[in-house]
Design a protein with these regions (language model features):
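Helix-loop-helix hairpin linking two adjacent transmembrane segments in secondary transporters
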Residues: 4-42
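Glycine-rich segments within core transmembrane alpha-helices of 12-TM secondary carriers
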Residues: 1-17, 223-234
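Juxtamembrane intracellular "pre-TM" segments in multi-pass secondary transporters
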Residues: 48-86
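Helix-to-loop junctions at the C-terminal end of transmembrane segments
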Residues: 17, 133-150, 241-242
Length: 277
C-alpha cells in the first residue's frame, strides 16, 4: 500500500502533472485507487478476530480513563523509574532533525529548478527504493550489533545527511544543471537510506519499550511524542528560510540533531536496554 501510494500516486502523478496538468493527473490517480479499493473491499474476506469486552466511556468514564490512559502511563514510570525522562527525551528528539527539514524539501527542489519529472524519478521512485534498502539494512544491523549502538549511529546519520543539502544549495549558483541533478541523486540516496535505517531502529526501540499489556496505547503515545512536536516545529521552517535562506536552514536542521546524538550516546554507554520484559 505504501509503495504503491508513493510510486504510483507521486511518481506517476508528478509525471502526468507535468504533461497533462495536475487536475487531470489527480483525477486519474483517484480513479485508480478508488477502483482498487472497491475491488479489494468485495474480494477480500474479513479476518477472524477475538471480540473483547469493551468498557464504554459513557457508562464507566472513570474506569475507561484509567484503563485507557492512566494505567499505561503509570506502567511506563513503574518499569523505568528514573530513566523514564531519558526515554521520553530521546524519543522526542530522535527524528526532529529530519522531520524539521522535510516540509521544505519540495519547495527547495522547485527553487533549484528541477522539473516535476526529475523530482518524481529521483525523490520518489529512486528514493523509495533506497529507503526499502535502508529498512533491511537497519534490521540486519540491529540483529548483528544490538540496538543501543544503532540508536546512536542512527542519530548521527540523521543529522549528518542534512549537510549535503547545504552543498546542493551551493550548486544552485552553478551554471551547469547536470552537476545539480547528479548530486541530487547522491543526496537523496544518502538521505532516504538513512530514513529507512533510522525508521527501523526507531520502531525497534519503541517496540522494546512498550509493555505487552498496554501495547496499543503506549505505542501510540510514544509515536505521538516523536512526531507531533517535530511536525509543529516544522511549521516554522518556511519562516526560517525566508529570514535566513536555505543555507542556514539546513545548518539549523543539522544542529537540531545534536540533542538526539547526546542522548543516544548516554543510552549506548550506560547500556540502558529499554525492554518490556
Amino acid at each position: 500500500w505504501r509503495v504503491g501510494g508513493v510510486w504510483f500516486a507521486q511518481v506517476v502523478g508528478f509525471i502526468l502533472g507535468g504533461t497533462i496538468g495536475y487536475s487531470k493527473a489527480y483525477l486519474i490517480v483517484a480513479l485508480v485507487f478508488l477502483s482498487l479499493s472497491v475491488f479489494i473491499f468485495f474480494k477480500m474476506p474479513e479476518p477472524e478476530r477475538i471480540v473483547r469486552p469493551y468498557i464504554s466511556v459513557f457508562s464507566h468514564p472513570g474506569r475507561w480513563l484509567k484503563d485507557s490512559f492512566v494505567d499505561p502511563v503509570l506502567d511506563l514510570y513503574d518499569r523505568y523509574k528514573s530513566e523514564v525522562g531519558l526515554l521520553l527525551l530521546l524519543i522526542f528528539f530522535y527524528r526532529l532533525s529530519d522531520m524539521y527539514l522535510g516540509p521544505m524539501a519540495m519547495p527547495f527542489y522547485r527553487e533549484m529548478g528541477f522539473t516535476e519529472i526529475e523530482v518524481a524519478l529521483v525523490t520518489n521512485f529512486f528514493g523509495t527504493a533506497v529507503t526499502i534498502i535502508g529498512v533491511f539494512a537497519g534490521g540486519l544491523l540491529v540483529h548483528r550489533f544490538g540496538l543501543e549502538i544503532n540508536i546512536f549511529y542512527g542519530a548521527v546519520l540523521t543529522a549528518l545527511t542534512n549537510l549535503p543539502f547545504v552543498y546542493l544549495n551551493y550548486l544552485g549558483t552553478d551554471l551547469d544543471p547536470t552537476n545539480e541533478l547528479q548530486f541530487l541523486w547522491a543526496v537523496i540516496g544518502m538521505d532516504n537510506f538513512t530514513q529507512g535505517y533510522v525508521g527501523t531502529v526507531a520502531i525497534t526501540f519503541i517496540s522494546r519499550v512498550v509493555s505487552p499489556t498496554f501495547t496499543a496505547t503506549q505505542y501510540a503515545l510514544l509515536v505521538l511524542l516523536g512526531t507531533v512536536p517535530s511536525r509543529i516545529l516544522g511549521g516554522s521552517s518556511g519562516f526560517v528560510v525566508n529570514e535566513f535562506g536555505y543555507h542556514d536552514f539546513f545548518l539549523i536542521a543539522c544542529a537540531l540533531g545534536i540533542p538526539a546524538i547526546v542522548l543516544s550516546y548516554i543510552v549506548w554507554k550506560k547500556k540502558l536496554i529499554f525492554s518490556s520484559s
